[in-house]
Amino acid sequence: MNIKTRFAPSPTGDLHVGSVRTALYSWLFARKNGGEFILRIEDTDIERSTQQAINAIIDSMKWLKIDWDQGPYFQTQNLDRYKEVINQLLKNGSAYKCYCSKKRLEELRNHQIINGKKPRYDGYCRNFDQTKIKNQPCVVRFRNPQQGYVIFNDLIRGKIKYNNQELDDLIICRTEGIPTYNFCVIIDDLDMKITHVIRGEDHLNNTPRQINILKAIGARVPEYAHLSMIIGHDGKKLSKRHSAVGVMQYRDQGFLPEALLNYLLRLGWSYGNQEIFSLDEMKKLFSLNTVKKSASLFDQQKLLWYNHFYIKTLSTDYIAQHLLFHLKQMGINPYMGPALADIVTLFRTRCKTIKDMASSCLYFYKDFEQFDHQAAIVYLKPVATKKLQTVQAKLTNQTNWTLESIQDILQQTAHELKVSMEAISMPLRVAVTGTSQSPAIDRIIHVIGKSRSLKRIDMALKYINI
């Protein structure tokens, strides 16, 4: 069998982590089995679909390095095909036109709720003589079987059984003539020869209806796998209130694609106790057999842990490329300071996000106008004057600008003034960086350069003597 999977998002908003996990699992299943992965944009909700959302989907997939073999396809380019099948269903009696008004349907729903029944269409138009009604607005409903069961084997959940009596007649075409998502997806999967439909459990209730439609047109039924939902700490479906954001917002917050992919892979799937997976390992090891059925808890701290791991372990040049993006976003010219690789080396063990790293290294690329207020109160006191002057003089006379020579100067100053290294380094740190938090000050001075270091020490001395 030639395995084919697909990812079929709706372009009505940002691409969120739940959708990305679905895309990842579908992609990995195809890659593991030597199959094809298709990207399909389900844009039949014309009022809510936007080009911005389409761009966000494609940009997100590219950023995550989830590539596709075919597509992107768009449902709105296939409307004639959907209407062809709808007409086929109308002709063979597997579908019918429904003329029920919104008012009637609302009254029906309220009556069912009041009487403790599950809201569902009652089949009012199911047996109407359709030839007697003309030129009235209507929807088209699928005539769902009223007897028997729909039974299928979910590749994650096992055998699932639905009684057809529990299923109402699904709308497959709206009043304005636009086919519904639940119908279009069936025809697309059929025409694209999708063999495995991997999607979220929120689609589980659609599956028996879709299987019945496939049987009505004499088509094969694909394999199904429904992923458990992702929840927040309150046990509810993950949403914006849990700080869940779109994929490109994670990029903008300083997360690496490797971290997000690795975290989402483990959010519902495991391979022994292994936590870290390369892309090649993901493709080799992934299996639906070990995808868990229960809901997965989204843990922002765990995602940060993954991100910090990759910041520390991926190549310096690769991290520097991501740092370049964030510095440019902040309006910083990275060519007005030290090499980005040097910055990565200084900060990679301290910063959990690339945005953090960019914010922490700004003083390397632009001069600050004032010192951190609290740091200046504590460390830029008259008692620091002699220490800063001594270091300033020694740095001025230093011609061999190396890390070792700077370390020697700081040690010499501490020895000459009979003070601790901390008594030298803290006022010097505030002077050169503007803050009391930074990597080792000798490394900072070495990377930031002689001219800028001396200029800032002079600024600190003037601040003290105001």
Curated annotation (Swiss-Prot):
Q: Name one GO cellular component term.
A: cytosol
Q: Which reaction is recorded as catalysed by this protein? A: tRNA(Glu) + L-glutamate + ATP = L-glutamyl-tRNA(Glu) + AMP + diphosphate
Q: Which InterPro entries does the record associate with it? A: aa-tRNA-synth_I_cd-bd, aa-tRNA-synth_I_codon-bd_sub2, aa_tRNA-synth_I_cd-bd_sf, Glu-tRNA-ligase_bac/mito, Glu/Gln-tRNA-synth, Glu/Gln-tRNA-synth_Ib_cat-dom, GluQ/Sye, GluRS_core
Compartment list = Cytoplasm
Q: Where is this motif: 'KMSKS' region?
A: 237-241
Q: Name one Pfam family in it.
A: tRNA-synt_1c
Q: Name one GO molecular function term.
A: zinc ion binding
UniProt motif 'HIGH' region: location:
9-19
Entry EC no(s): 6.1.1.17
Which top-level enzyme class is recorded in the Swiss-Prot or TrEMBL entry? ligase
| Primary site of residence | cytoplasm
Q: Which GO terms describe its biological process?
A: glutamyl-tRNA aminoacylation
Q: Where does ATP bind?
A: 240
Q: Which HAMAP family match?
A: Glu_tRNA_synth_type1
Name the job this protein performs: Catalyzes the attachment of glutamate to tRNA(Glu) in a two-step reaction: glutamate is first activated by ATP to form Glu-AMP and then transferred to the acceptor end of tRNA(Glu).
What protein family does this chain belong to?
Answer: Belongs to the class-I aminoacyl-tRNA synthetase family. Glutamate--tRNA ligase type 1 subfamily.
Quaternary structure, per UniProt, is: Monomer.
Q: Which PANTHER family match?
A: GLUTAMATE--TRNA LIGASE, GLUTAMATE--TRNA LIGASE, MITOCHONDRIAL-RELATED
Which NCBIfam families does the entry link to? gltX_bact
Q: Write the protein's name.
A: Glutamate--tRNA ligase
* Taxonomy of the source species: Bacteria, Pseudomonadati, Pseudomonadota, Gammaproteobacteria, Candidatus Palibaumannia
